Swiss-Prot record:
One of its GO terms (cellular component) is small ribosomal subunit. The keyword Repressor does not apply. One of its GO terms (biological process) is ribosomal small subunit assembly. Protein S19 forms a complex with S13 that binds strongly to the 16S ribosomal RNA. Coiled coil: none annotated. It holds the Pfam family Ribosomal_S19. This is Small ribosomal subunit protein uS19. Signal peptide: none annotated. HAMAP family: Ribosomal_uS19 (MF_00531). Keywords: Ribonucleoprotein, Ribosomal protein, RNA-binding, rRNA-binding.
Amino acid sequence: MGRSLKKGPYCDAKLLKKIIDMNEKGEKRVIKTWSRRSTIFPEMVGHTIAVHDGRKHVPIYITEDMVGHKLGEFAPTRVFRGHGAHTERSTALK
């Protein structure tokens, strides 16, 4: 379910302020954020934002195709390492 159109997209105020300040100064540095729920705005294109995945910050370079999506979509929180392998040791225990 999406957000109501009358409310508009959400972006963390501090994160958006940092982006706007960096655009005015012409700086490009990594910004750490825990706000996975923030929507990517056109002002963010070209910046690298490190999004927290619950364990570490995953650096994400923002491109035009990402505008309108959430930051959390690009930093997965779960890592699937595969099911157990069928080895001699595991079958011998039965």
